[in-house]
């Protein structure tokens, strides 16, 4: 399995506030509304179509204030993978966030999409941090 790790992002919130959002798919999927079709979500799973490809995901593990682990659900992505959204609270108003993706790619796929996966992880982490930093304080 190959591992891709995003650049660390700073979120000016306590880890528990960030966790409350990232630990539920029904909180996350509205951000995808203009990018995907046929979006459905519950607290623990979601599915959507992107560029004609159906994606099904489910939350496999949660550690409050620390991380969530997401895996492909049955009938979804045809590759074995897992990704984590990890949080490390530095202070009450400073949490570091990063994404880690472990995916089983053959050599050809790794050469074709490896750099794109790294770039996508960095963009997603940056987008989550930007959205959390821009949201009103609770």
Which residue stretches match the model-derived regions?
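Hydrophobic ligand-binding cavity/cleft-lining segments
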Residues: 1-40, 45
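Beta-strand/loop substructures that line and gate deep hydrophobic ligand-binding cavities in soluble
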Residues: 75-126, 130
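Short secondary-structure boundary/capping segments
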Residues: 1, 38, 59-60, 86-89
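Short, highly charged C-terminal tails/helix-capping segments
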Residues: 129-138
């Amino acid at each position: 399995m190959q591992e891709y790790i995003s650049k660390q992002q700073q979120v000016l919130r306590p880890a528990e506030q960030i966790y409350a959002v990232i630990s539920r798919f029904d909180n996350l999927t509205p951000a995808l509304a203009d990018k995907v079709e046929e979006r459905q979500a519950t607290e623990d799973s979601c599915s959507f179509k992107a560029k004609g490809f159906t994606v099904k995901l489910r939350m496999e593990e949660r550690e409050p204030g620390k991380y969530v682990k997401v895996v492909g659900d049955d009938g979804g992505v045809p590759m074995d993978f897992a990704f984590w959204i990890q949080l490390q609270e530095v202070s009450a108003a400073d949490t570091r966030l990063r994404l880690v993706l472990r995916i089983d790619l053959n050599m050809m796929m790794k050469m074709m999409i490896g750099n794109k996966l790294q770039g996508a992880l960095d963009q997603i982490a940056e987008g989550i941090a930007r959205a959390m930093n821009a949201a009103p304080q609770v």
